[in-house]
Structure formats: C-alpha cells, structure tokens
Design a protein with these regions (language model features):
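Acidic, low-complexity intrinsically disordered segments
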Residues: 4-50
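Regulatory sensory and allosteric helical modules in signal-transduction proteins
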Residues: 125-165
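Helix-loop-beta substructure at the N-terminus of cytosolic sensory domains
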Residues: 85-125
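Short hydrophobic beta-strand micro-motif common in sensory/regulatory domains
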Residues: 165-173
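Signal-transmission linkers at sensory-effector interfaces
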Residues: 36-82
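Short hydrophobic/glycine-rich mini-motifs in sensory/regulatory modules
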Residues: 172-181
Length: 218
C-alpha cells in the first residue's frame, strides 16, 4: 500500500477519524515553519491562522483600493467644478493644467486642438498636427499608456522630452474628435500598458465637454 492508496481509502471512508480519534493524537507532522513536529490538530490550527492572515491582507488591500478610488474620484470632482467655473477657453486650459499638476501630480501635460475655436487659434494648443496624428486620435477608443510617445507627441514636451519615460494619450471628442491630451512622467511606472484607464477616460470626457463650449464645429 502506498501513500495514494491511503489517501484514497480516507476519501472513501470519511468517518475513519471519527471512529479512530486516538489516531489524530498519535500522528505527528513536520512543523511548516520549523524543524520540530506537531500534531495534526496543531497543523490544522496553523493552516487556519495562515488563511486568516491571507484574508486579512486581502481585506486591507481592498480597503486601500476603495480609499484610493475615493481619493481619485474627489480629484476628478474638483477638476469638474473648476472647469464649470472657467469663464473662457483660457480658463478651461489653465484649470486643466493646474488640476492635473497639483491634484493628480502629473508633471508634464500637453494638449493639441484642431477645428474652429472662435479666435483662439494663436495659442500653442492650436499648433498644427499631422494628418496621421489626427487619424490616430480618431481611432483611439480608450486612453493609451506606455513607455513611448506616440507619433510626434514627444515634441510637445520641448526640452523635457529626452528624460520622459512613460506617456498617456487621451482623445478629446464630442460628436467628432477635435484634440489630444498627452501626459508624461520621468517615472517608468507612472503610465504603463496594463494600467486601468477609466479615470483617464473620465478626465478626457470632462475636459472635452468644457472645451466644446468654445468650438463651433467640434
């Protein structure tokens, strides 16, 4: 009889230890965290303690996740209020830059717009972009994050561009796509391909809605 036969026997006879309780007190197992031996009962207690620790760690992680989400939601709310209070396109842009830097700690922000924005075309945000970039922005269903700037967006960050290691791009759109928001950081882990982008998408929607007030054809 081998170990597998014994295991199978115990499965077939679940009442074995009820009928032979003394066996439990006579069988000793190696301690999982040391060299001594312990009884099966002690082993079960240790196993339960380990499970409890894992559950506690998971609960703490979920609580932290919820608190982090609440904090981000509050920041999004503050940006929304600032955009509502903005009195012109310049105010929308300044509120966007300020809140992203101060609340979201995004160190590098650039934005490009195209279309008719009622006399604001002299601003840097209306610098010409390539047709390929427009096509890319139109195809961007969700924010894109990763270690490389897409198309020529790295040039938007001027002399800071060479030291930037992660990027996020968010399409700005209403009925049609009319712009692109680019975020960047020196930290490689700040914007990475597998990260969740729900809040980035919400930010894009808020900023787009605020900007649309000043566009006649977006």
């Amino acid at each position: 009889m081998n170990a597998e036969d014994i295991a199978q026997y115990l499965k077939v006879h679940p009442n074995f230890f009820s009928e032979h309780a003394h066996v439990l007190t006579e069988v000793y197992l190696p301690h999982p965290h040391g060299g001594r031996t312990i009884s099966i009962g002690e082993c079960q207690v240790l196993a339960l303690r380990d499970k409890v620790k894992l559950l506690e760690a998971k609960l703490a992680e979920l609580i932290q996740f919820g608190e982090d989400n609440d904090a981000v939601s509050e920041k999004v709310h503050r940006l929304g209020l600032a955009l509502i209070l903005a009195r012109d396109l310049e105010g929308v842009l300044q509120s966007t830059y300020f809140n992203l830097r101060e609340d979201f700690a995004v160190p590098h922000i650039a934005l490009r717009l195209w279309g008719d924005f009622n006399g604001y075309s002299d601003k840097i945000e209306f610098s010409p972009v390539t047709p390929d970039l427009r096509t890319y922005a139109e195809s961007l269903a969700h924010p894109a994050c990763g270690p490389h700037a897409l198309y020529d967006t790295s040039t938007w960050f001027g002399q800071d561009a060479p030291r930037l290691r992660s990027f996020a791009t968010v399409a700005l759109r209403g009925e049609h796509t009319f712009g692109l928001l680019a975020l960047a950081s020196e930290e490689a882990e700040r914007f990475y391909p597998e990260m969740g982008t729900l809040y980035l998408k919400r930010l894009g929607e808020l900023i787009s809605t605020a900007l649309l007030q000043y566009s006649s054809n977006a």
